[in-house]
């Protein structure tokens, strides 16, 4: 157990991208982004991500780019800038087909019915939305109404993610997010009434005062609502990055051994309810597109987690939003003032990014295959990975990883340590390891 504990306590990225965001630099700006956009083929398929960095209040555990707002004016002002950014992008990449659209935050539904409609209308005027396969939005179940769900159905939303984290009252008090099971069930019902039947529920383990039984009970209650997908994320305690997390006493956070038990117990419960484990921390019903893609080897991973999205480019809209194009990554200004200033200055909002090399793309493929399918055939890829395999030797000896000379596979026992296996192929990690969260 001591070796497992040491592994679990390692600081490694979640690998929603490679290279990861801490390595982005100001060497990539609006000019490079405009060139990359202009190089997209006319028939390129796009995925759009819209970031709304506002919430009615900030939960203590939150690690998102967001801030509390209690007045309407800042939200309206921001929504106007989103519309301006869409128009700016359309000057370069108008008419491209959009296959996936995701609203994140923050709480994107805080925009309200008017702006949700207006922004979709702006997108429709700028891009081809006729082939959208998935139109998803993140929702705070504490703030949902019939007007909101009707608007979501009207603009074409077909998947909703509900942030729950834990149903236990004492854990909810500890994280500053009170939402009884009945409130979440009500939100699911409202979504079903308007035909939005693809529901995701997000849970967390590793929260303050949370036991393995708490996580297990929350998994059971979530499964009783029959969502198509359930995510079980490990809480990332990074108070050096997120000031709100400084309000959480580290003494009441579960240790590594308990975190492992929490994740394992919940996974067993979800399996008993018929959910299939997807990658590191997702679960889906067998007929859900995510489960089908996993079986067929078509699963991908991006900044929203596991996805079936295979678009050629991801376009990020809004403050802090990240995009991915064939040439590399771009990120908008993280701070609100910087984002507004750039948009008002008739510029793209890009402030940093990363131009990827052939070697970066090769390693990104290895990491994605490990994170998605828990296996990769290194013989299919050019390169010498003997040093990486040597670093994984202890995990092979412990039965967490198997290697037959070409195919590297993470065992069932090793699944919780998938990020560590992926990290062996991260050429940039040593310089910034301390900036990431624990592996489990």
Language model features by range: what are they?
Residues 407-411:
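Minor-groove-contacting beta-hairpin "wing" of winged helix-turn-helix DNA-binding domains
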Residues 413-440:
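Short, amphipathic alpha-helical interaction segments positioned at domain boundaries
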Residues 38-42, 68-92, 96-383, 439:
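C-terminal scaffold of the Radical SAM
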Residues 382-397:
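Short amphipathic alpha-helical interaction segments
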Residues 50-66:
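Local cysteine-cluster metal-coordination motifs and their immediate loop/turn environment
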Residues 1-46:
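Flexible, acidic/Gly-rich N-terminal and inter-domain linker regions that tether
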Residues 396-406:
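A short, conserved structural fragment
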Residues 47, 60, 135:
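Divalent metal-dependent hydrolysis catalytic cores, especially in the metallo-beta-lactamase
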């Amino acid at each position: 157990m001591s070796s497992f504990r040491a592994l679990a306590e390692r600081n490694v990225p979640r690998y929603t991208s490679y290279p990861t965001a801490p390595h982005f630099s100001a060497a990539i700006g609006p000019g490079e982004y405009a060139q990359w956009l202009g190089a997209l083929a006319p028939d390129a398929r796009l995925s759009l991500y819209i970031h709304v960095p506002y919430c009615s209040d900030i939960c203590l555990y939150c690690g998102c780019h967001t801030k509390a707002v209690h007045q309407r004016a800042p939200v309206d002002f921001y929504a106007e800038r989103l519309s301006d950014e869409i128009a700016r992008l359309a000057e370069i990449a108008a008419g491209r087909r959009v296959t996936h659209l995701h609203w994140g935050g923050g709480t994107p539904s805080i925009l309200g019915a008017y702006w949700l409609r207006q922004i979709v209308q702006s997108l429709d005027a700028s891009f081809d939305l006729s082939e959208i396969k998935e139109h998803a939005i993140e929702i705070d179940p504490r703030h949902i109404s019939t007007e909101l769900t009707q608007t979501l159905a009207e603009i074409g939303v077909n998947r909703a993610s509900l942030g729950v984290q834990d149903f236990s009252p004492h854990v909810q008090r500890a994280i500053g997010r009170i939402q009884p099971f009945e409130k979440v069930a009500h939100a699911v019902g409202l979504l079903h009434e308007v035909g939005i039947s693809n529901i995701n529920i997000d849970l967390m383990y590793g929260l303050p005062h949370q036991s393995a039984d708490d996580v297990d009970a929350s998994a059971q209650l979530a499964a009783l609502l029959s969502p198509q997908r359930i995510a079980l994320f490990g809480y990332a305690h990074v108070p050096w990055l997120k000031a709100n997390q400084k309000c959480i006493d580290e003494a009441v956070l579960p240790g590594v051994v308990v975190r492992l038990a929490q994740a394992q117990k919940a996974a067993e419960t979800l399996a008993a309810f018929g959910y299939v484990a997807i990658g590191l921390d997702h679960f889906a019903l067998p007929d859900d597109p995510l489960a089908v893609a996993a079986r067929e080897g078509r699963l991908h991973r991006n900044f929203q987690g596991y996805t079936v999205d295979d678009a050629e480019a991801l376009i990020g809209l809004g403050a802090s939003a990240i995009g991915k194009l064939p040439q590399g990554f771009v990120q908008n200004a993280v701070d609100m003032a910087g984002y507004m200033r750039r948009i008002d200055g008739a510029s793209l909002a890009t402030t940093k990014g990363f131009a990827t090399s052939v070697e970066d793309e090769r390693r990104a493929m290895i990491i994605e295959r490990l994170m998605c399918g828990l296996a990769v055939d290194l013989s299919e890829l050019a390169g010498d990975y003997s040093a990486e395999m040597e670093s994984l030797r202890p995990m092979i000896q412990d039965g967490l990883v198997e290697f037959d000379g070409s195919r590297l596979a993470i065992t069932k026992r090793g699944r919780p340590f998938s990020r560590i296996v992926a990290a062996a192929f991260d050429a940039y990690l040593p310089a910034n390891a301390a900036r990431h969260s624990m592996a489990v």
